[in-house]
């Protein structure tokens, strides 16, 4: 009996050693409590690419929203096209949505404070009305929403509207000009425009030189035609100067515009080129003294002068006179000479010192000075 008992114990012991001595197969490990039981997979997954529509909508800038409507008869409305052709005499009414609307329209209407034009602001829209229209009213009409903070307003570029209106009038192919002869200055550093604008959208317009008589081609390189502006000289130079005119043809009719004198500008744009000169730098008591400030510049650029002089604090009476004229410097080059002269009579001790002249134009200002001594 003991033998069988011992034999049974030996068999149980060997069985336990077999169980505890087993090794886990490769790539296997016991799972930890709470571990994810989902088996890993080697399946490739393509990254999700957003649709083109989604990406474009995220990256694109906000589109400009047209806020302009044209009022038709019987209370009908329509969005105006980029260009409109209307008969002269018709009434035009434009409305733009917004509680604060800014307007732009042909300068002709603003220059003469024309009573035919009415601009009103209603609670929800701005309103522009033009009655008894003429061919001279041809041009761009535009509006925009104003974003205001107190008294400071700026244009909302995303909410605008515009239309260019041709007012066709019998016998008028060109937008009328206030004169029979005009001057166009050719600056080497900016475009020049011969303002031959027509009143008929379909009109064919050509540019001509008076002498020698020939057509000047608008080749798209040196000269282009813009129906809203006229003939544009992209890079003016001295060979372009001379007398030119435009010819328009439409509906079997033809018409010639006013003439334009093209003058080349010798002085480039920039702050005034200024010099100062005194009639004498040493003055005796009782004598008169004049100080001259001179600017050479572009023919169509105005210059403003200001003076600082020794007797200014004592309210010393002086005479200041400003003048300008055009001078021709050969080969058709034209320059504007602007001058300001300050004159002091009966020179006294308080008049001695620095005479300072400041000349200013749209590009900047220049200050020059000279000394006048008492002798």
Swiss-Prot record:
Residues 1-21 form the signal peptide. Glycans are attached at residues 132, 219. Pfam families: Ig_3, VEGFR-1-like_Ig-like. It is found in: Secreted. One of its GO terms (molecular function) is platelet activating factor receptor activity. Residues 40-50 have a biased composition (Basic residues). Keywords: Disease variant, Disulfide bond, Glycoprotein, Immunoglobulin domain, Repeat, Secreted, Signal. Changing residue 23 to Y: In CRC; somatic mutation. Disulfide bonds join 96-143, 293-357. Residues 22-64 are annotated as: Disordered. The keyword rRNA processing does not apply. Its main location: secreted. One of its GO terms (cellular component) is extracellular region. It is linked to Colorectal cancer: A complex disease characterized by malignant lesions arising from the inner wall of the large intestine (the colon) and the rectum. Genetic alterations are often associated with progression from premalignant lesion (adenoma) to invasive adenocarcinoma. Risk factors for cancer of the colon and rectum include colon polyps, long-standing ulcerative colitis, and genetic family history. A polymorphism in PDGFRL has been reported to be associated with susceptibility to Behcet disease. Behcet disease is a complex multiple-system disorder characterized by recurrent oral ulcerations, recurrent genital ulcerations, typical skin lesions, and uveitis. Behcet disease also involves joints, blood vessels, musculoskeletal, neurological systems, and the gastrointestinal tract. This is Platelet-derived growth factor receptor-like protein. It comes from Homo sapiens. The lineage of its organism: Eukaryota, Metazoa, Chordata, Craniata, Vertebrata.
């Amino acid at each position: 009996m003991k033998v069988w008992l011992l034999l049974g114990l030996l068999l149980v012991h060997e069985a336990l050693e077999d169980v505890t001595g087993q090794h886990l197969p490769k790539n296997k490990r016991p799972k930890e409590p709470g571990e994810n039981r989902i088996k890993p997979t080697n399946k490739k997954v393509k990254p999700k690419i957003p649709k083109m529509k989604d990406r474009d909508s995220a990256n694109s800038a906000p589109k400009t929203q047209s806020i302009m409507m044209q009022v038709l008869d019987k209370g009908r409305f329509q969005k105006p096209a980029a260009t409109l052709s209307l008969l002269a005499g018709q009434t035009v009414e434009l409305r733009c949505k917004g509680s604060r609307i800014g307007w732009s329209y042909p300068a002709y209407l603003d220059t003469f404070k024309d009573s035919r034009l009415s601009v009103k602001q209603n609670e929800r829209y701005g309103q522009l009305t033009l009655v008894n229209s003429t061919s001279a009213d041809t041009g761009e009409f535009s509006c925009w929403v104003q974003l205001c903070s107190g008294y400071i307003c700026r244009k909302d570029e995303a909410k605008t509207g515009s239309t260019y209106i041709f007012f066709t009038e019998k016998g008028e192919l060109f937008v009328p000009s206030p004169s029979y002869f005009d001057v166009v200055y050719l600056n080497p550093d900016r475009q020049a425009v011969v303002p031959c604008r027509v009143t008929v959208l379909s009109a064919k317009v050509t540019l001509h030189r008076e002498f020698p008589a020939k057509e000047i081609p608008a080749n798209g390189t040196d000269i282009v035609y813009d129906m809203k502006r006229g003939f544009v000289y992209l890079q003016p130079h001295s060979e372009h100067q001379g007398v030119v005119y435009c010819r328009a043809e439409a509906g079997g009719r033809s018409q010639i515009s006013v003439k334009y004198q093209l003058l080349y500008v010798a002085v480039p744009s920039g702050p005034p080129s200024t010099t100062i000169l005194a009639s004498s730098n040493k003055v005796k008591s009782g004598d008169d003294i004049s100080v001259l400030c001179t600017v050479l510049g572009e023919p169509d650029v105005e210059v403003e002068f200001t003076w600082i002089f020794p007797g200014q604090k004592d309210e010393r009476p002086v005479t200041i006179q400003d003048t300008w004229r055009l001078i021709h410097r050969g080969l058709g080059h034209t320059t504007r000479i602007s001058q300001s002269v300050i004159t002091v009579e009966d020179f006294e001790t308080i008049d001695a010192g620095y005479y300072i002249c400041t000349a200013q134009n749209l590009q900047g200002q220049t200050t020059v000075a000279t000394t006048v001594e008492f002798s």
